[in-house]
Amino acid sequence: MAKSKSSQGASGARRKPAPSLYQHISSFKPQFSTRVDDVLHFSKTLTWRSEIIPDKSKGTLTTSLLYSQGSDIYEIDTTLPLKTFYDDDDDDDNDDDDEEGNGKTKSAATPNPEYGDAFQDVEGKPLRPKWIYQGETVAKMQYLESSDDSTAIAMSKNGSLAWFRDEIKVPVHIVQEMMGPATRYSSIHSLTRPGSLAVSDFDVSTNMDTVVKSQSNGYEEDSILKIIDNSDRPGDILRTVHVPGTNVAHSVRFFNNHLFASCSDDNILRFWDTRTADKPLWTLSEPKNGRLTSFDSSQVTENLFVTGFSTGVIKLWDARAVQLATTDLTHRQNGEEPIQNEIAKLFHSGGDSVVDILFSQTSATEFVTVGGTGNVYHWDMEYSFSRNDDDNEDEVRVAAPEELQGQCLKFFHTGGTRRSSNQFGKRNTVALHPVINDFVGTVDSDSLVTAYKPFLASDFIGRGYDD
């Protein structure tokens, strides 16, 4: 039986009173068909598949996680209480009648399984790998929802890519990055930048036609971006772009089918177009607030993105305003840098470094940040956007940082053994479900897998519990 942790976490100061509750939370430690001598030794990542299967007769909703450990990738079914993840009020017209002919809602008709049972179907059963990336350590995975050719892409620690398909255990396409003199051990494990040169990343365009991946070339001179076909000839390298003056481009994200940005260790975001010359369209320089460690772009709107720093600072931006500032010469007659201002500035408590950022795929205003401690912060920027609505233009008052923080931090999750602070060890260990709003999966270094959905202050008030 999975362990229930309904007492963990605390919601942010969005409204009061704000309960410290979960709508659902389940955890379990997988068992494996092959012997694993030291589970802590293996790198772990996870991502969700997008399929959801409701079963009204059982009162359940089934979806699945893709979980990697070393070179092995597993699929883990997650069975959830339907009532928790489905809004009965949206479909009242389809309510059934009872035997007396009286109308009754699905809430009354649908069983409500106990919380904490999401992994009961796999609890105690040895897992067998769905896919194997032989000889590699998986560092990131992405599910390909609408691809006819492949089911998922996995990236290894050395920057290689592999495409996997259901029912086939080995990769169907590979982009291999060979380990040679340019990627010798002493270069990958740089003494001047420990561990940083091992960082690589990839992202898939909105239409799934193109992959962009970033990596170090191993010489500690410049990082590399590779634009790769994911349509007609998956795995074919279309173009290679060198990013001068950067050792590592540690994050890449698409904004749409062609526009993407890379985030480098020189604290500069560069915005590119896959169809144009090998120079960025424009840049955003962030020399303050510590090292620029992560960023993500919204998948609901093409314009919003968030940056995170080693000091725990988080900034929300509008790409249109950033681009416009590069052409505005009003205050730059003497060659000054562009004045590029963020929409909002937030922070992790205690200076907890920002190691990962995940924009919601179901909401234009929500995103999640992951701290170096492993803590997960849930943010909703609706309050900030409503203050800057055009209808309120004449009465806009800039919110104080504490006010903005209290209104936008809607939930805070502390999970399992996520206590060691390793800047690059926590990337890709938290995943937002692409269909179920606010549903999160996490994996800890000891392989503890947790799935949870917060019970938010707005939900609490909406159900009549506020005073």
Curated annotation (Swiss-Prot):
Key words, A-Z: Meiosis, Repeat, Transcription, Transcription regulation, WD repeat
One MF annotation (Gene Ontology) recorded for this entry: DNA-binding transcription factor activity, RNA polymerase II-specific
Classification via Pfam families: WD40
SUPFAM superfamilies: WD40 repeat-like
An annotated GO BP: protein-containing complex localization
Region Disordered, residue ranges: 1-22, 84-121
WD repeat copies, ranges: 244-282, 287-327, 349-389
Bias (Low complexity): 1-12
Ranges annotated as biased composition (Acidic residues): 87-100
InterPro entries assigned to the protein according to its UniProt record, in alphabetical order: WD40/YVTN_repeat-like_dom_sf, WD40_repeat_dom_sf, WD40_rpt, WD_repeat_RBAP46/RBAP48/MSI1
PROSITE patterns for the chain: WD_REPEATS_REGION
GO terms under cellular component: cytoplasm; cytosol; nucleus; Rpd3L complex; Rpd3L-Expanded complex
Note: Present with 3750 molecules/cell in log phase SD medium.
Purpose of the protein: Transcriptional modulator with roles in meiotic regulation and silencing.
Name by which UniProt lists this protein: Transcriptional modulator WTM2
Protein species of origin: Saccharomyces cerevisiae (strain ATCC 204508 / S288c) (Baker's yeast)
